[in-house]
Amino acid sequence: MLGAALRRCAVAAATRAGPRGLLHSTRTPGPAAAIQSVRCYSHGSQETDEEFDARWVTYFNKPDIDAWELRKGINTLVTYDMVPEPKIIDAALRACRRLNDFASTVRILEAVKDKAGPHKEIYPYVIQELRPTLNELGISTPEELGLDKL
């Protein structure tokens, strides 16, 4: 999104420039130029952790979620620079179960392990928190399936 905002600013600046380019502009920037630069960098208020978690839990708890939306949500969630909270993963696993998509459950758990990176205590904590859900839904972890040895 930042790249698009910067491109919009560059295009706006180029359209305001004179015939000889930006350095030799015939017009002096007025108050609108200051407003334009502020708009290019404002993205609204920051989302709190609780709002972020609630947004994703709500997304995965949609009763009419389909397989494409599930995969899109998982892919988007994996791109963030963080390990999702267990309650988000719980909602995603339940959505997988509603859709009978076992492959996605394994993929989610593998992604969580990968996102934990060198912090070896995170993945066991997440599995510990998810153990009741995993047992309830009949989901095996990648380690239980022997996928960690491949």
From Swiss-Prot:
Pathway: Energy metabolism; oxidative phosphorylation. The modification Phosphothreonine is found at T141. Pfam families: COX5A (PF02284). GO terms for cellular component: mitochondrial inner membrane; respiratory chain complex IV. SUPFAM superfamilies: Cytochrome c oxidase subunit E (SSF48479). It is a peripheral membrane protein. InterPro entries: Cyt_c_oxidase_su5A/6 (IPR003204), Cyt_c_oxidase_su5A/6_sf (IPR036545). The modification N6-acetyllysine is found at K87, K113. One of its GO terms (biological process) is mitochondrial electron transport, cytochrome c to oxygen. In response to mitochondrial stress, the precursor protein is ubiquitinated by the SIFI complex in the cytoplasm before mitochondrial import, leading to its degradation. Within the SIFI complex, UBR4 initiates ubiquitin chain that are further elongated or branched by KCMF1. Component of the cytochrome c oxidase, the last enzyme in the mitochondrial electron transport chain which drives oxidative phosphorylation. The respiratory chain contains 3 multisubunit complexes succinate dehydrogenase (complex II, CII), ubiquinol-cytochrome c oxidoreductase (cytochrome b-c1 complex, complex III, CIII) and cytochrome c oxidase (complex IV, CIV), that cooperate to transfer electrons derived from NADH and succinate to molecular oxygen, creating an electrochemical gradient over the inner membrane that drives transmembrane transport and the ATP synthase. Component of the cytochrome c oxidase (complex IV, CIV), a multisubunit enzyme composed of 14 subunits. The complex is composed of a catalytic core of 3 subunits MT-CO1, MT-CO2 and MT-CO3, encoded in the mitochondrial DNA, and 11 supernumerary subunits COX4I, COX5A, COX5B, COX6A, COX6B, COX6C, COX7A, COX7B, COX7C, COX8 and NDUFA4, which are encoded in the nuclear genome. This is Cytochrome c oxidase subunit 5A, mitochondrial.
